[in-house]
């Protein structure tokens, strides 16, 4: 199924990030590992029970990173799906937990509750009719009837949205389904991770990478063959420059920067997060790729403490 595979962002302190996404939002912590390219940094994964594609939000925990800035060439907002009847619950919960948020607004006929995480990342909950019938992680902190059901989608802020729109519809299997208030909406599927929106803001200040910003957005490929076909289409017909395939242990990845400047990834659905630990204990222990196991003691010595036991 086409759509968003995962979103990777940048956080500050790992412990604060863990507390917010597991205890306030009620997501499952599915993997505790490191940035394979910077193994002194945690790479933290959150999602549903097994980390299905379309539910996974990940963070590079760069504690001393400068604050990111929203603007052109960045993802402006990352949105999650919840049952339409749960918006009142979440508004009350955000007040109770001291989460910075705005009033519920309407977009494309849906109720949207914008909020900000502890590092300034802009996010939202979208009330989706019928989402209550979708599977959800049963956390200790959020009743399952109100739980997050994965991603709704992401909003990109771009100077010129036309080339990105062409890439989405031609190479990444999205269709344009609406336009409202300067925002174009594209959909790949009616379920989780199905929506990408483009907000054009010509001449607006460019965004910068840092705490609270999205690092990249990954799109789904069923297998290596589909990944290669999608990447080839993007390269040959849209002029992007793609990397070679990289093994990220839980999926295989190809990266490219789309015409508007946002870093995109195409990630395979397999092998998934149970490849190195049982589903029942996902996220309990620090997992490393085989090429870093010989450095485990040194890596553990520099990583900050992060207690994740139930």
What does each model-found stretch correspond to?
Residues 1-16, 75-82, 130-165, 208-220, ...:
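N-terminal beta-strand motif that seeds the catalytic metal site of vicinal oxygen chelate
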Residues 2-12, 33, 63-159, 179-199, 238-310, ...:
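Vicinal oxygen chelate
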Residues 9-53, 96, 104-114, 156-199, ...:
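Core segments of cupin and vicinal oxygen chelate
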Residues 13, 48, 82-84, 129, ...:
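Non-catalytic surface loops within mature trypsin-like serine protease
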Residues 31-36, 46-80:
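Conserved donor-binding loop and adjoining core beta-sheet/short helix segment
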Residues 145-232, 236-242, 246, 258:
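Surface-exposed interaction/gating patches
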